[in-house]
């Protein structure tokens, strides 16, 4: 049977699941925060395309100019997430989703498509080895993070200068996050409790405007962690991962 795909729109957004957290029967704060965030982003050309099934199979991308990441460039798409999880894996859905994004970019006369990668694959980033099969290449770096790009016209985007700073003045734990990922709110609350119980100094910065995201002091997709002023990871972490970071082991 041919797969059916759905693009979220202002009309269907209230009633469609958002893939990442679909097993809960009650309203989930992170999902509803993401839904509200998407309601504004869809007006800017943001795309959330998913399999018409109760599964985690989707791609999410936006015009780079309005993507909430410290990456600069003109006329590009930025991919936030491409995720195929569980039983649907191995059926070619990831390839079809990527191909649909690239087709959209070409149809709109875009200069290309970019996404965040790293020297070592991060758990909370899309599979960069998969992207490279389509011709994505590293065009810029910020520490161990890479800007992967498929250019159609020879132009390339780049990390904002602030993203290469990789330091903040705060001590202890510092986290920046957006509502782009529905897991963020719950993760923040659990980390906040963990730090309070152990008397760990912690600051959590909810990024709520595009201009904030565009000037963040590190590579960023929807989450960033600093410890004692030094950038650690874009992975969403729990208490155990924080303890490793405190022991100077990066995640």
Predicted ranges, named:
Residues 1-52, 162, 171, 182-183, ...:
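Short amphipathic alpha-helix that is part of the acyltransferase structural core
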Residues 80-89, 119:
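A short, internal acetyl-CoA/4′-phosphopantetheine-binding micro-motif in the GNAT/acyltransferase core
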Residues 84, 90-105:
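Conserved acetyl-CoA-binding loop-helix of GNAT-fold acetyltransferases
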Residues 228-251:
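Non-catalytic, surface beta->alpha helical segment in thiol-disulfide oxidoreductase systems
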Residues 54-65, 78, 83:
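Conserved beta-strand in the GNAT
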Residues 67-79, 89:
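A conserved beta-turn-beta hairpin within the catalytic core of GNAT-like acetyltransferases
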Residues 116-117, 132-149, 232:
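Conserved catalytic-core motifs of GNAT/GCN5-like acyltransferases
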Residues 105-123:
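Conserved GNAT acetyl-CoA-binding A-motif
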């Amino acid at each position: 049977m041919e797969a059916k795909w759905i693009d979220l729109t202002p009309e269907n957004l209230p009633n469609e699941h958002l893939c990442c957290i679909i097993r809960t029967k009650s309203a989930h704060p992170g999902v509803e925060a993401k839904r509200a965030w998407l309601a504004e982003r869809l007006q800017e050309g943001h795309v959330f395309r998913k399999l018409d099934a109760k599964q985690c199979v989707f791609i999410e991308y936006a015009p780079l100019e309005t993507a909430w990441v410290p990456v600069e460039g003109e006329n590009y798409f930025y991919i936030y997430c491409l995720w195929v999880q569980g039983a649907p894996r191995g059926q070619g859905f990831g390839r079809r989703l990527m191909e649909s994004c690239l087709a959209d970019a070409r149809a709109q006369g875009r200069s290309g498509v970019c996404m965040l990668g790293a020297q070592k694959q991060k758990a909370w980033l899309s599979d960069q080895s998969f992207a490279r099969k389509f011709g994505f290449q590293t065009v810029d770096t910020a520490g161990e993070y890479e800007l992967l790009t498929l250019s159609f016209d020879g132009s390339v985007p780049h990390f904002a200068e602030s993203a290469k700073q990789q330091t903040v003045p705060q001590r202890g734990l510092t986290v920046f996050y957006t509502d782009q990922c529905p897991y963020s709110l719950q993760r923040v609350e659990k980390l906040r409790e963990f730090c309070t119980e152990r008397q760990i100094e912690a600051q959590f910065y909810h990024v709520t405007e595009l201009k904030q995201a565009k000037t963040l002091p590190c590579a960023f997709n929807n989450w960033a962690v600093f410890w004692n002023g030094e950038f650690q990871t874009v992975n969403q972490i729990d208490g155990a991962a924080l303890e490793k970071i405190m022991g100077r082991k990066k995640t």
